[in-house]
Amino acid sequence: MSHIIELPEMLANQIAAGEVIERPASVVKELVENAIDAGSSQIIIEIEEAGLKKVQITDNGHGIAHDEVELALRRHATSKIKNQADLFRIRTLGFRGEALPSIASVSVLTLLTAVDGASHGTKLVARGGEVEEVIPATSPVGTKVCVEDLFFNTPARLKYMKSQQAELSHIIDIVNRLGLAHPEISFSLISDGKEMTRTAGTGQLRQAIAGIYGLVSAKKMIEIENSDLDFEISGFVSLPELTRANRNYISLFINGRYIKNFLLNRAILDGFGSKLMVGRFPLAVIHIHIDPYLADVNVHPTKQEVRISKEKELMTLVSEAIANSLKEQTLIPDALENLAKSTVRNREKVDQTILPLKENTLYYEKTEPSRPSQTEVADYQVELTDEGQDLTLFAKETLDRLTKPAKLHFAERKPANYDQLDHPELDLASIDKAYDKLEREEASSFPELEFFGQMHGTYLFAQGRDGLYIIDQHAAQERVKYEEYRESIGNVDQSQQQLLVPYIFEFPADDALRLKERMPLLEEVGVFLAEYGENQFILREHPIWMAEEEIESGIYEMCDMLLLTKEVSIKKYRAELAIMMSCKRSIKANHRIDDHSARQLLYQLSQCDNPYNCPHGRPVLVHFTKSDMEKMFRRIQENHTSLRELGKY
């Protein structure tokens, strides 16, 4: 029979560490939150080997008094709350008194601190939760905490750590969120001697956004605000033209604390209404100030889950704040920004229905019709507008570095026309099966068709020897382009075209790290991005199958797909990419095409291995036989009974 015993404090701390300290990013979060609670205006985070070897946090806060340093490593010892009433009005990020002892129990911890007016500072060294020394030391006002050999005494936890790049990505995400939560604090993240993130700490949220997400993104975000007796909402959301493929760029803060809340995320999307494209999500940084009595943060040790009173009222306020701000904006994308790019393109884009065509051939020839080619060369220069004059020196220096040395395209994320897509959603879960099926397709006979009309700018009508054919023009071109892309994607040899003016692509630091890990997948499909500055990549050549006007949107789409796909084979990646690009690059519904283009499309469809289904499996064309038509018009009776026999005469 086992007996009930009280666990030793060190063992209890290690158990608590299992909930509080999941990975190096947890250490960074807890220590930085302590620094924020200490009133710091500058916080420096230094890490080595993604935090597994070393995490060091230096702040200029209040510090810890000499006689309280050792007490800080005891469980549930805190300066944040004093009594039960304080627990229901928490105004600090920390309050449990678990973080520091939990960290100390699974690492070698060195703490150096001093308070204002003290004759000396204090140095504490603890190993595995056991304090080894506490001695006077020289230190500036503030605290420096150094955590080394994390999880050295819990090897099971080490076993489940991901790659260094993945762990570093989590740390960058934590620091970015804290920087957005507290724009009044200067944050600097240094990994293995290289600065990854820096915010100015001026108190201006737009500047913090520019330092983290980039200058271009910051300029495309609009301010929101709303309030009632219980809540005060402020922040920035992106214009509908600036979106991402997932919700990771939505940051919600309650009283300076980053939280995750599904209902508030839903309220943000509701605020955009139908202005957002299908499957796309905005960038949002929203601060909610609330009476602490209405928010319960004592739910989970990580404190990311918060229970909110009057949550429905808050959701309404958030939605209204976004909707009202969007009403004040001109949501047509700024044509002036892309004027240089689109001058040639706009001049050449003429409604095809007015072209003088002399096409008298009833049936298409068995040689591919000539297709007109367009060359589009455009220069794009980034300019600092008046709105951007107050941005951080860091952001300006980055911009100068991009524009001065050479003439470059600074790529922007362009929204795809998801609202016009006939198939806006891709079921990526079925890609493997679909790809295997598509690869097994063999060339099949296709009837000779005579095109004679179009309906609603969507369906083509053609007749063959055995009846009427109705063709979905989007599905038809999607099938044609899919087979083109399927053959060309990945054909790297002799398929590159040099760019006269290279393109620069910018990503947040955590996305840039993950892209570096998965860059070989891009190279397999002929896209070669080279590092260029902080969190930026340069493209000097592009696959021959990618039109120059599609470079910006195409590369960003490929990178978004790559970031969303954690484990992907080359085969699956190429299939996803071919399906995605064929869908987005095909003519849409309600788009009239001339007779020549229609005949050309039918010819291209006839050359496909499988002309009967689009890559999603939907039918490309339907067939009515002559007999079917006669039955519909009652020209023949199915049982061949005469009208006289039916008694009609």
Curated annotation (Swiss-Prot):
User: What one GO molecular function would you report for this record?
Assistant: ATP binding
* Signal peptide segment: none
Family annotation (CDD domains): HATPase_MutL-MLH-PMS-like (cd16926), MutL_Trans (cd00782)
Show the disulfide pairing: none
Q: Does the keyword Transcription regulation apply?
A: no
Q: Which GO terms describe its cellular component?
A: mismatch repair complex
Q: Which domain of life is it from?
A: Bacteria
Q: Which GO terms describe its biological process?
A: mismatch repair
* DNA repair among keywords: yes
Which keywords accompany this UniProt record? Answer: DNA damage, DNA repair
Q: Which family does it belong to?
A: Belongs to the DNA mismatch repair MutL/HexB family.
Name the NCBIfam families for this protein: mutl, PRK00095.1-3
What does this protein do, in the record's words? This protein is involved in the repair of mismatches in DNA. It is required for dam-dependent methyl-directed DNA mismatch repair. May act as a 'molecular matchmaker', a protein that promotes the formation of a stable complex between two or more DNA-binding proteins in an ATP-dependent manner without itself being part of a final effector complex.
PANTHER family the UniProt entry points to: DNA MISMATCH REPAIR PROTEIN MLH, PMS, MUTL, DNA MISMATCH REPAIR PROTEIN MLH1
Protein name in UniProt: DNA mismatch repair protein MutL
Q: Which organism is it from?
A: Streptococcus pneumoniae (strain P1031)
